[in-house]
Amino acid sequence: MSEVNTPGRGRPRAALTFDDGHVGNAALLPVFIKHGIRPTIYICSSIVTHQRTHWWLTPGAQRAGVRRLIKLPNAERLEELASYGFHQHERSIDTPISGLSREHIEAMLPHVDFQSHTRFHPTLTRLARDECTEELACSKQEVEEITGAACEHFAYPYGRYAARDVEILKATGYKTARTTLVGWNDEKSDPYRLRAFDIEDNSSVQWFAAQMTGVPLAWRILPLGAIKAAFIRTLGLTGIRKTRTNAGNESAT
């Protein structure tokens, strides 16, 4: 993320980011090295290196409904997960470890930028102010302890945040925060509300390139007339207008 903030000599740039710090990210290291890519991985700092499981991957969360749990006040969510035997501060015993190990991160450090995604991946808007401050401040400190480098960038869990959370991020020393809103960023973008494109695991290079143009996004969210108008503007066909002949038929000139 820091490299993207530097001048690009007029060329557009893309930052490749991953969320959560899943153990499977370690298998991508040879790909990063081969293509000279330095991605940013936003890690849950109290899950990675601790032999723990991301809470939504546990059997209890799956049974209770992850989407519903995300919307609960944090204390209620943790209480319900505890009823299924999950305690976020404890080491995973009955479920596979889902976070990167310290050995993984040490091997990846020369080629990967690790930044913050909170400690345990709560919904920020469902936290009390003191809880939110603790998550953001402690995660920043933990990431710096793990990597030995400054932690200045953040990604909102589930893309959910409020003005209060932005204030806390600024006060805690973060310089940017990435949302899940779709779109591009430029020099006018709010650094604490950065947009992104969600790329699925099975996306081809061609589909990735297509998404970067914004055409698939426009096709999904814009009315057909707006898409047509955009293409006309792109092609420079601004001189097209409709006139009516004597016979009452329309023709383009």
Model-derived segments and spans:
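Short amphipathic alpha-helical segments and helix-helix/interface helices
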Residues: 28-30, 102-106, 166-170
